[in-house]
C-alpha cells in the first residue's frame, strides 16, 4: 500500500478551515431560526404527535427521539428496527447530554460538529502523508451529503468519520484500531460495511486469509444488534424504507422538471454512472489494490439507491458520501484532472443548495 512521505506538509490548515466554516454555518442557521437547536432536528407532527397527514419532518428527528426516550421512542419511528439499528449517534448524544432534554439537541450538534472535523482531519492527514495537497480534504467537509446531514442531525458525519479513520488505519497497517473503527461505523450507518467489504475483496485477491476473516468480522456487532432488534421490536415499519434497485431504476419513475430531482440526476447520478466502469476496470486490473473495490462498491450504492433518495439531490448526496470518501482516499494515485472532477462531484450540489439548506425552516415542536 502507499507509504507515508516523511516531508509532508501540515494537514491542520484545512482542518481549522473546516471547523471555522461549520461554526459559521451553525451560527447563521441558528440566527435565522430563533437560536433553537431544534432547527437541526427537523421535527414533524406525523411522527412527534402521530398526526396522520402531518408534516413528516426529517431523519434527524428519529435520532432525537431515540436519544431522548430510548425504547419509548419506538412508536415515533417510521421504521423502528431500521432506525434503532443506527444506535451509535443517539446513544452518544444521550450520554453527552447527561439525560437532559434541554441539552440533548445541543449535544447532537456538538457530536456531529466534532465528527465532521475529525473526518476531515483523517483524510487531510492521509493526503498530506502521501505528498498530496491536504486542502483536497475540503471536498469531504464541503460535500453536499455531509453538509446536509450536519444541518439535519443525521448520522452520516459520525458514520463516515469512523469509516474514513478506520479504513486509513487499516491501510496504514494499524489493524487493531482500524478493526474497531470499521466495526463501530455500521452502528451509525449500515452502508459503511462497504468499506470493510472493499478491503476484504482486495485481501481475498491477495490471499490474505487472516485479513479477510478479520474484515468480515467487523460486520458482526451491527449484525447481532440488528438481529436483536428484529426479534425484539414488535412495531411494524410505517411508510416503509425503500429497497435497493437496478442501477438508475430509482431515478426514472419520479423523473420530472423539479430542480432537486434534476440535480440528483445530473450532478450525482450520471457522474456516478460514468465513474463505475473505470472503478470496475481498476478492480480487474489491480484486484489486490483496495481503492478500485472501495470506489466501485460505493458508486454502485448511489446508482441502486431507492426512489426516496432520488427525490432530491440532497437526499442522494447522503448516499454518495461513501463514494466521495473512497475517491479521496485514492487521490495519491489519481491524476490532477480526476482530483478536480471528484471535488466538483462532491461540492457542486453544496454550492447550489447551501442557501436553501440554511433558509428552509421546519416545524420545531418542543414535545
Language-model regions, residue ranges each:
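Hydrophobic/aromatic-rich transmembrane helices and adjacent perimembrane loops
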Residues: 311-338
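Membrane-lumen/periplasm interface segments of specific transmembrane helices
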Residues: 21-36, 192-302
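Membrane-interface alpha helices of multi-pass inner-membrane proteins
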Residues: 163-169, 176-203, 217-220
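Multi-pass, polyprenyl lipid-linked donor-dependent membrane glycosyltransferases
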Residues: 111-115, 135-165, 170, 185-194, ...
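Start-transfer (signal-anchor) and selected internal transmembrane alpha helices
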Residues: 1-44, 339-342
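Short hydrophobic/aromatic helix or loop-helix immediately within or flanking a transmembrane segment
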Residues: 57-101, 322
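Signature aromatic-anchored transmembrane alpha helix within multi-pass, membrane-resident enzymes
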Residues: 215-223, 336-364
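Transmembrane-helix signature of polytopic, membrane-embedded enzymes
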Residues: 103-107, 120-143, 161
